Structures are given as C-alpha cells and as structure tokens.
UniProtKB/Swiss-Prot annotation:
Localization terms from the record: Plastid, Chloroplast
Source organism superkingdom: Eukaryota
Tissue distribution: Expressed in leaves.
Keyword Transmembrane: no
Source species taxonomy: Eukaryota, Viridiplantae, Streptophyta, Embryophyta, Tracheophyta
Record GO cellular component, one term: plastid
Pathway(s): Porphyrin-containing compound metabolism; chlorophyll biosynthesis
Name this protein carries in UniProt: Magnesium-chelatase subunit ChlI-2, chloroplastic
Entry keyword annotation includes Nucleotide-binding: yes
GO molecular-function terms, A-Z: ATP binding; ATP hydrolysis activity; magnesium chelatase activity
Length: 418
C-alpha cells in the first residue's frame, strides 16, 4: 500500500489509452454522434415522472445542414480558450474535472484556492475536451432527440405525434452564472398575464435550461446568495428545474455538471451546501520558481498568438479527448469488488461522515478513474487517489485541528485498507 502516495495525479492523466469496445457501446447523455434515427422508440414510465415519458413509433430525425453551418461559423469566430493540456500543475483539480466529465453523476466539483491560480482558466478550458452532442434545432433546452428525460415539453409533444425532429451537432454548453444573477434569470420566468388572458403557459427559460446536458460554472460560488445555491444544487441532484408562480407550475430537464470555484479567504460555504458537491479540490499557489517562469511564458505565448499556441497542443488535446470518450463508453463495464465497497463505507463511518453521499461518490469516482486508466476493475489504489477529494469537505470542522482534512482522510484510508 505504500505505493499509493508515490503516484502523482499527473501520471494518471497521461496513462495509455485503451481501444474502444464494440461500436455498439452506449454513451452517457452528454455524448452522441451524428446519425439518423428511425424506428421504434419505447420508454417505460417511472414513478412520479410518467408525464415525462413517451411511447412512440417511427420517429425520424435529420441533420439540418443550414443550422450546422451556422454552428461551425460561430465556433470559428468564438473567443479562443486556453488548452487544457497546456495547463501546468494543478493535477488534483484537473483530475476531479475529468472524472466528472466521465461520470456526471459524481455530482460536480468544488474548487477552492488562492487568487490567480488558474481555477477559472482550467474550468473553461475543459469544454474543448467534451464531444459534440446531438440536440433538437431551435430548442432552448438542448433536448436530446432520443432520451425523453432530456426533452423539453414541446419536443416530447412532437415525438408523441410522430413528427420529424430537425437536429444539429453542437458543442456542449459552458454556462457562466454571474454573481448578480436573480432567481428568475437562473430558473426562468412565467408570464402570468399571458397565462391568465390567453390560457397558455408562457415560459421564458433561464440559465438552468441553457445548461441542460452541459456544464454550469459558478465562479466565486461562496459569495453567491444561499437561496440561489440551494436552487442550483437541487436541480443538479434531481436533473429537473421546476418553476412555480401564482399556482402555475412548469418543469424542464436541467441535467448539468455543476462546477464551483472560490477563494476561502472571502468566505466559506455552509457545510450542508458543501456536502452536495461530489468532489472538492484544493488549489495552491505554485512555489517553484522555474515552474512559475514556465507558466508565465506559456501564458505570454497564448496571449500573443492564441491560434498558433492552440495548434501546438492540438495533438495532446485530441489524445485526451479520445481517452475521455473511451472512458465514458467503458464506464458501465467497470466493476468494484464487494470487499472494497465495505472498506470504503468503513472509512466513511469511522470518520463520522454524515449521510451516504460520501460512500456513493467514492464508488463512482473510483470507477471513473479506473475507466480513465483503461481498466475494468477498481483497485485499492484508485480508491486511495480519489477518497481525499470525495470526503475532505464532508468532515466536521474542529476549530482546534490544524491538520488538513485531506490528510486525515488519507490516514484513515491507510488504517482501514492495510
């Protein structure tokens, strides 16, 4: 077990890729390839959600070439993003982000650290590594033409009627939530006057609708109003956003990867809110002089010629993107032994972690890490790497304890696993 601490997260990010499984491997709801869909589609109703499930036949979708061309033009004119592969250091933060991309059900990541340590740059660079998804053209919810759990109401009605859906391929959205955003801007608004006079539910979608099947990033989340944080975390956990005004209720899909960042010197999040983030990454200022020089020089190169700088890292970016895509495909095949599950729960119990979220997140993160490394079996080493990030923010604060919570988690891990 002594080898666990001898392996840095950077070695994980550069591990060899494995070949993709059969071409029929399923992908998660964030990744679909361009294709025509036809034939029978059958979805079974679920408890308390039957109105969002449909059963139809002979539904076909076709790629809209005009919309596709517009997307390509907008992509080329977009502001260049710093390459993820070019970010120096901060391996813990990068690993947490990658694991959430592989398995969005981990529950997002909270990144806390000093000012100017690359938190926002790293998060925004993540969008380049994500595959394109198929969405219904003109739909404000980025509806998935094949999954009713990710469909808006209008799209579901079209599917039920057997109408064709015009679809396009687009990059996954990275939605920024500003600190000054109101609840109506985040959740959406209902036009009460139109509802009363015309008898229709006039709904103006908010940021949660735009973030569906994408990433919602909240910078300085520790300064955001508590009630907005509650709304975000509830939507992220349930996958749905419900807006209720004057007796009118509207729900729409809101499945997104929630990423928050902040500086602990400016304020802490409530423990109840911290617990809702799947993982927690701590980012520190680089102290090595040579490494600091390298970071400054790389940033200067990017600022002077972003296009040329991005081309330098294009091959590494493509390799990492393929590795992520393969890991997402293989995730469902990754197994974790019962003995490891018991030991994980024992660590959580002995650390007096409230609830069971910690247990579930560790299991998911360890499986995602194994998939990233190209394996179908979780090892104790995988658990040892991810467990500090999964439990650090869930421990009860002791004002007399000066030791980092992550170290306490690691010590307990060795005690249980050896």
């Amino acid at each position: 077990m002594a080898s666990l601490l001898g392996r840095s997260p950077s070695s994980i990010l550069t591990c060899p890729r494995i070949s993709s499984p059969s071409s029929t491997s399923s992908m998660s709801h964030l990744c679909f390839g361009p294709e025509k869909l036809s034939g029978r589609i059958q979805f079974n109703p679920k408890k308390n959600r039957s109105r969002y499930h449909v059963s139809v036949m002979n539904v076909a979708t076709e790629i809209n070439s005009v919309e596709q061309a517009k997307k390509i033009d907008s992509k080329e004119s977009a502001r260049p993003v710093y390459p993820f592969a070019a970010i120096v250091g901060q391996d813990e933060m990068k690993l947490c982000l990658l694991l959430n991309v592989i398995d969005p059900k981990i529950g997002g990541v909270m990144i806390m650290g000093d000012r100017g340590t690359g938190k926002s740059t790293t998060v925004r660079s993540l969008v380049d590594l994500l595959p394109e998804i198929t969405v219904v053209s003109g739909d404000p919810y980025n509806s998935d033409p094949r999954d009713p759990e990710c469909m808006g109401k209008e799209v579901r009605e079209k599917v039920q009627k057997g109408e064709e859906l015009s679809v396009i391929e687009t990059k996954i959205n990275m939605v920024d939530l500003p600190l000054g955003a109101t609840e109506d801007r985040v959740c959406g608004t209902i036009d009460i006057e139109k509802a009363l006079t015309e008898g229709v539910k006039a709904f103006e979608p908010g940021l949660l609708a735009k973030a569906n099947r994408g990433i919602l990033y909240v910078d300085e989340v520790n300064l955001l109003d508590d009630h907005l944080v509650d709304v975000l975390l509830d939507s992220a956990a349930s996958g749905w956003n419900t807006v209720e005004r004057e007796g009118i209720s509207i729900s729409h899909p809101a499945r997104f990867i929630l990423i928050g960042s902040g500086n602990p010197e400016e304020g802490e999040l409530r423990p109840q809110l911290l617990d809702r983030f799947g993982m927690h990454a701590q980012v520190g200022t680089v102290r090595d002089a040579e490494l600091r020089v390298k970071i400054v020089e790389e940033r200067a190169r990017f600022d002077s010629n972003p296009k040329e700088f991005r081309e330098t890292y294009q091959e590494e970016q493509l390799k990492l993107q393929e590795q992520i895509t393969t890991a997402r495909s293989n995730l469902s095949a990754v197994q974790i032994d019962q003995d490891l599950k018991v030991k994980i729960s024992k660590v959580c119990a002995e650390l007096d972690v409230d609830g069971l979220r910690g247990d579930m997140v560790i299991n998911r993160a360890a499986r995602a890490l194994a998939a990233l490394q190209g394996r179908d079996q979780v090892t104790a080493e995988d658990v040892g790497i991810v467990i500090p990030n999964c439990l650090r923010h869930r421990l009860r604060k002791d004002p007399l304890e000066s030791m980092d919570s992550g170290i306490l988690v690691t010590e307990k891990f060795y005690e249980v696993f050896t």
